[in-house]
Amino acid sequence: MLETSQTIPELVNWTREREFSLSLSTERLAFLLAIAIYNNERLDGEMLETDLIDIFRHISNTFEQSAETVSTRANNSINELVKQRFLNRFSSEFTEGLSIYRLTPLGVGVSDYYIRQREFSALRLSVQLSIVADEIQRASESAEEGGDEHYWRKNVFAPLKYSVAEIFDSIDLSQRMMDENQQHIKEEIAELLTKDWQTAIASCERLLDETSGNLRELQDTLNAAGDKLQSQLLRIQDCVIGHDNLYFVEQLIVDLQAKLDRIISWGQQAIDLWIGYDRHVHKFIRTAIDLDKNRVFSQRLRQSIHHYFDHPWFLWIAQAERLIDLREEELTLREEEALGELPEELQYESLADLHEQIVETMQSLLIEYRLQNTPIDLSEVLTAQLKQYPLANHFDIARIIIDQAVRLGLAQDDLNGIYPNWRSINENGAEVQAHVIDKY
């Protein structure tokens, strides 16, 4: 995000002294967005007051407001946008009564937030990452050639600071816009399901699939370019090792690496969260369908009982085996058919029994860790626990342990946005990607 050399008290006092305030109603915001669109269509970027009044007249008609007071309300809206520094007004004695208006950086930023930042696609992301790769490539080549401090500031620091960092910030902002878009889709799905869920199932499926596809496509693009960008940054970092006068370059490299890790990490986390929401919606739909069938059956049964003496009937009850639910969240351990009888020591244990045993084991381990104030290395815990169970049960055991560990603690490195490394947890190639849990 944006770096600043000012402290929080300085910014607070600066805002207080200038009496900054922002307040945009829906009508005023629509007016500002219309001004921004109109401004983009003009070559000079300047607007007259008559242009703004015409734009406001269209807004007023859209909001079905009175046409008799358009001029007065337009002047009030224009003055309010000028007061809040969304518009700049220019006038002189030579142009008395004829003012010229231009959007301020604040006006451009707010309108850009609502208009352009939603245009986030894999193509745009690919272009941005391509530009970043070229800039970092040139900066790494310049770093390997070397030079004085002025050379480093011009050929290495400047491209990274004012091109690469800004594109990273743009990608980060776009991700936050996608987060907001996901919330909007969730609200839309909730509204569909509360109105008429039977006809809304297809629409819900489409929204879920489109969002999942977009998230995966964008994350694949990030993953494909992430390693290459990190390797180029490491090349530059190697060149500044041992040069104390180039501390500003080293600090910038560290910041860029953290930003890139944070972008990639949140992209993957957003996918995982959306998968969980997808399962939740499908579970709700399944439950709703089952309940609806039960309501129809119970209604017909009540009617049949009520008219039994007029239309006698017989009732047969049958219980069919449940079909396998591919979206079932509660996984079970693998059951294999066996011939003959087994002693009690080898009888099959249910997942619930294993879950209780592992929870007790984890609790006893965590008590020791808390008393000794020792971080929990999840890979070591998994390795030790998996040795006690057959290979066929490793996946379920690991899932239970990870679920308990995540509920009981977190890692400081996760909060810092550091990407964890893969570590082996058994002899058959299974790996886990998790930081050491050091906060309970």
UniProtKB/Swiss-Prot annotation:
The gene is mukF. Interacts, and probably forms a ternary complex, with MukE and MukB via its C-terminal region. The complex formation is stimulated by calcium or magnesium. It is required for an interaction between MukE and MukB. It is found in: Cytoplasm, Nucleoid. Belongs to the MukF family. It comes from the Bacteria. GO terms for biological process: cell division; chromosome condensation; chromosome segregation; DNA replication. The lineage of its organism: Bacteria, Pseudomonadati, Pseudomonadota, Gammaproteobacteria, Pasteurellales. This is Chromosome partition protein MukF. The keyword Calcium applies. GO terms for molecular function: calcium ion binding.
